[in-house]
Amino acid sequence: GSEMCIRDSFSSLFPKHPYGTQTVLGTQENLKNPSITNIKNYYKQWYVPNNMAICMSGDLDPDETIALIDKYFGGLKPNPELPKLNLPKEDPITAPVVKEVLGPDAESVALAWRFPGLASKDFEVLQVVSQVLYNGKAGLIDLDLNQQQKVLNSYGYPMGLADYSAFILGGLPK
């Protein structure tokens, strides 16, 4: 389905970078033979205060919120030897990459383009372009494809990430 298309799109957009080489849970091979020692060591190295952020929103009581954060996270110790990530740079994409993904879900299509990361001015432009194309109401995709029922569903959105971003167009045929 579309989730598999997106995953494979990322492996094509980012063949060197963890965005395309790693999945959230890991590969089937990783999950077949997990080493408890390796899992614990990974957790101790990376799941540390100097490698995390706590995001809150809404009508919060600051004193109560700080108390809860201290209660649940105050005992965590930073890793003073946390390695600096030196992530690989991607080569330019010079030709289309086409992949066919087989699975049990209905047919779908996804097109994806790589862009600079969130801090880039290009990402701001990408967000504007995205809204012109698809915003759930009056974007070009909304008006010309979805509302006219030429497809079962179609969409377009930017995926903003730190090192690179992606723009994804996709849809489900009728």
Residue ranges of predicted features:
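Short beta-strand/turn micro-motifs at beta-sheet edges
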Residues: 40-43, 96-100, 153-159
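Short, small-residue-biased leader/transition segments that mark boundaries at the very start
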Residues: 1-6
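Active/ligand-binding-proximal structured segments within catalytic/core domains
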Residues: 111, 121-133, 141-143
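Histidine-acidic residue clusters that define the catalytic metal-binding segment
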Residues: 11-52, 84-89, 126
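M16 family metallopeptidases and their MPP-like homologs
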Residues: 7-29, 51-57, 107-116, 143-174
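Short, solvent-exposed loop/turn segments at the edges of secondary structure
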Residues: 47-50, 92-94, 103-108, 123-124, ...
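An aromatic/glycine/proline-enriched structural segment found at the starts
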Residues: 16, 53-117
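Sec-exported extracytoplasmic/periplasmic mature domains
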Residues: 14, 18, 36, 40, ...
